[in-house]
């Protein structure tokens, strides 16, 4: 009815007057879209992703002996629909590499699995010398163990603190990485890599 319509317009007018542009705290903008513990699982990994930090919290995967059928070639990282992740801008012209958490070289058993490792949800800001050095060497060692002794379960936990660096682009740089290995005999090893 016309009376109801006038009533709604009157309420809207009062609301707009109360929330003028000089009153910033009246109508806060709340972003309900950023999640701190988004669980993503596929045939390669299970991951807890933090959209506020634009980095993983942790990731789990298993390295197995396999026949290589795919090669990374010119594959590059891609964004996931409806997930706020880091992107190419976070890695441009600085010392940070796009560090695979679940390594591409451990999932060349199929093109589909290899491609999944190039999602930005599987990527962390990792100092270049670490990514290309000790981190890569341990990935290769784990593959070697999987070939000779059976599957190796891997869990990586990213360490953040109140003093973690936040880039101008908004992504948070991990302070370090814990890598836990569990072998077929249930023995375990843990490594810590400072970032």
Task: Walk through the language-model features, giving the residues of each.
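Sec-dependent signal peptide recognition
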Residues: 5-11
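C-terminal motif of bacterial Sec signal peptides marking the signal peptidase cleavage site
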Residues: 16-18
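Bacterial signal peptide processing site
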Residues: 20-22
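Post-signal peptide N-terminal segment of mature Sec-exported envelope proteins
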Residues: 25-42
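Short, surface-exposed beta-strand/loop micro-motifs that present aromatic residues
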Residues: 35-37, 44-49, 169, 178-182
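Short, His- and charge-rich active-site/binding loops that engage polyanionic ligands
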Residues: 39-97
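Domain-level detector of nuclease and nuclease-like folds
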Residues: 81-195
């Amino acid at each position: 009815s016309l009376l109801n319509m006038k009533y709604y317009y009157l309420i809207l007018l009062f609301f707009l007057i109360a929330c003028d542009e000089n009153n910033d705290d009246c109508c806060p903008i709340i972003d309900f879209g950023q999640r701190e513990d988004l669980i993503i699982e596929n045939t390669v990994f299970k991951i807890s992703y933090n959209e506020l930090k634009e980095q993983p919290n942790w990731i789990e995967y298993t390295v197995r002996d396999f026949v290589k059928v795919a090669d990374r070639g010119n594959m590059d990282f891609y964004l996931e629909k409806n997930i706020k992740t880091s992107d190419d801008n976070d890695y441009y012209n600085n010392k940070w590499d796009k560090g695979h958490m679940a390594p591409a070289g451990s999932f060349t058993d199929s093109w589909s699995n290899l491609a999944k490792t190039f999602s930005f949800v599987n990527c962390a800001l990792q100092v270049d010398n670490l990514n290309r050095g000790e981190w890569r060497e341990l990935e290769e060692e784990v593959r070697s163990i999987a070939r000779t002794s059976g599957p190796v379960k891997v869990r990586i936990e990213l360490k953040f603190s109140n003093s973690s660096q936040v880039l101008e682009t908004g992504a948070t740089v991990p302070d370090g990485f814990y890598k836990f290995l569990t072998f077929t005999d249930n023995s375990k090893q843990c490594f810590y890599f400072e970032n």
